[in-house]
């Protein structure tokens, strides 16, 4: 199914497929919605979820009513996409998908959820040494702007310098939720430092680390030449003897990423781009929701 979704250029179509059956949102906002704390009833309207219908009241009143709730807080949602050259790494198991495709599709789904909840949401893209913004706003038109920017993103160059990122953190002055998707091959890095700084500014930071199964298992072809796409260091040929060293270093690196996130109370979820996208999205949101309780 992931391979089929990768063939379409219609990001909205992919979003509809992924979000079908996803039964929860990003957070609790102040506008009325299907929250936990019961507030009042209102008449059923087309598009309401059937699980919110009060069937006992239907039996008494012979009309459909849905339960509403007053949600707790209202914060902006920011999507942060790493669109540097390393995100072009493709799956060796599923044709047509790479890290960037997976990252932008997951973030597009988060944007769609935010739009459904009535939240303001914006987009930050790190690519080719610069930062690109889509300012936070609400509504269907904003969703179209964000989807267009995500669709145009190409995996190019390296991360912006630390001073450039630091100078651009003004976008999140008010308390915000920040959903960042990257391979986090560099940590510490200008990106990780910016995200940690945002967390220290009391923003709710939630990270998604994307890897390929080949990266995890080190199932690279022996003798083939590999080049770091973000550094000009020539070709590296991985022998069989190099594999175990690679695995150890890779394991240590991502354990460091996980430990740093835990130490700073940052939600962190690691996924393979070969996994079903809907399952990754659901797990990431549930992990974030569990911390919020």
Model-flagged regions — what are they?
Residues 51-61:
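N-terminal low-complexity, intrinsically disordered segments
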Residues 35-38, 52:
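A residue-level signal for beta-strand positions that form part of recognition/binding surfaces
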Residues 1-30, 38, 43-48, 57, ...:
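Exposed, interaction-prone extracellular/peripheral surfaces
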């Amino acid at each position: 199914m992931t391979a089929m979704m990768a063939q379409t250029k219609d990001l909205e179509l992919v979003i509809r497929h992924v979000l079908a059956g996803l039964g929860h949102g990003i957070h609790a906002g102040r506008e009325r919605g299907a929250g936990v704390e019961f507030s009042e009833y209102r008449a059923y309207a087309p598009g309401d979820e059937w699980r919110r219908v009060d069937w006992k009241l239907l039996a008494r009143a012979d009309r459909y009513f849905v339960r509403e709730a007053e949600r707790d807080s209202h914060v902006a949602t920011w999507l942060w996409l790493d669109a540097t050259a390393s995100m072009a790494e493709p799956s060796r198991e599923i044709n047509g998908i790479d890290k960037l495709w997976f990252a932008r599709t997951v973030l597009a789904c988060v944007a769609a959820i935010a739009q459904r909840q009535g939240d303001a949401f914006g987009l930050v893209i790190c690519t080719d040494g610069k930062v690109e913004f889509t300012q936070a706003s609400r509504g269907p038109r904003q969703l179209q702007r964000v989807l267009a920017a995500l669709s145009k993103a190409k995996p190019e160059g390296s991360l912006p310098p630390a001073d450039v990122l630091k100078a651009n953190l003004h976008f999140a002055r008010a308390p915000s939720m920040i959903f960042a998707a990257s391979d986090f091959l560099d940590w510490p890095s200008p990106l990780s430092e910016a995200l940690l700084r945002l967390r220290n500014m009391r923003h709710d930071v939630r990270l998604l680390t994307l890897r390929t199964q080949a990266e995890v298992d080190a199932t690279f072809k022996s003798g083939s030449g590999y080049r770091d796409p973000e550094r000009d260091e020539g070709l590296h040929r991985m022998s069989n003897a190099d594999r175990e060293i690679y695995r150890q270093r890779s394991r240590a690196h991502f354990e460091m990423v996980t430990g740093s996130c835990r130490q700073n109370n940052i939600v962190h979820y690691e996924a393979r781009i070969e996994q079903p996208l809907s399952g990754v999205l659901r797990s990431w949101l549930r992990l974030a929701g569990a911390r919020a309780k």
